[in-house]
Amino acid sequence: MKAVIILGLVLLSVTVQGKIFERCELARTLKRLGLDGYRGISLANWVCLAKWESDYNTQATNYNPGDQSTDYGIFQINSHYWCNNGKTPGAVNACHISCNALLQDNIADAVTCAKRVVRDPQGIRAWVAWRNHCHNRDVSQYVQGCGV
C-alpha cells in the first residue's frame, strides 16, 4: 500500500511539471506546426524566444502584479491581451482561447496563438525576451545539429 501511495505522488509530481522540451525536439515540433519562416521569422528565432521565455517548459507561468495579468506556457503568452484566464481585468482574448490551453504538452494551440501575436504590428517584438536575448544576435545555435 505504501508503494502505491509513493507511486501516486511521483506520478502526480510528473503530471504537474508538464513537458519540458529538448531544444531539437522543440525545433522539429515548431517546424512541423508551421513556424519556420512564418511572417519572416526564422525557426531559430522561435526556439530562442521559447528558451528565454519559458526554458522550453509548457507549464511555465508568470504573474504580473502591475496589470494583474499572467503569462502562460512555452511562449509566455499574456492573459491581458491574448487569452482568457477568467481573472485578468479588461482582458481582450485576441486568440479566443483559454489560457489553460497554452499550458498543454501539445503546443499546437500555443503556436496558433503565437502566430496571431506576430500578425500584430509589433510582430515578434511583442516579446521582451526576444528583444533582450535574440534580436540582432546569431541565433543559429538554437537549431544547430537539429536537422531542421
Swiss-Prot record:
Catalysed conversion reaction: Hydrolysis of (1->4)-beta-linkages between N-acetylmuramic acid and N-acetyl-D-glucosamine residues in a peptidoglycan and between N-acetyl-D-glucosamine residues in chitodextrins
Keyword Transport: no
Cross-referenced SUPFAM superfamilies: Lysozyme-like (SSF53955)
Signal peptide, first to last residue: 1-18
EC number annotated for this UniProt entry: 3.2.1.17
GO CC, alphabetical: extracellular region
One Pfam family recorded for the sequence: Lys
Cell compartments where the protein resides: Secreted
GO BP term, example: killing of cells of another organism
Disulfide bond residue pairs: 24-146, 48-134, 83-99, 95-113
One MF annotation (Gene Ontology) recorded for this entry: lysozyme activity
InterPro entries per record: Glyco_hydro_22, Glyco_hydro_22_CS, Glyco_hydro_22_lys, Lysozyme-like_dom_sf
Active site, UniProt feature: 53, 71
Gene3D superfamilies to which the protein is assigned, alphabetical: 1.10.530.10
Other remarks in the entry: Lysozyme C is capable of both hydrolysis and transglycosylation; it also shows a slight esterase activity. It acts rapidly on both peptide-substituted and unsubstituted peptidoglycan, and slowly on chitin oligosaccharides.
Function: Lysozymes have primarily a bacteriolytic function; those in tissues and body fluids are associated with the monocyte-macrophage system and enhance the activity of immunoagents.
Name of this chain's protein: Lysozyme C
Organism: Miopithecus talapoin
Originating gene: LYZ
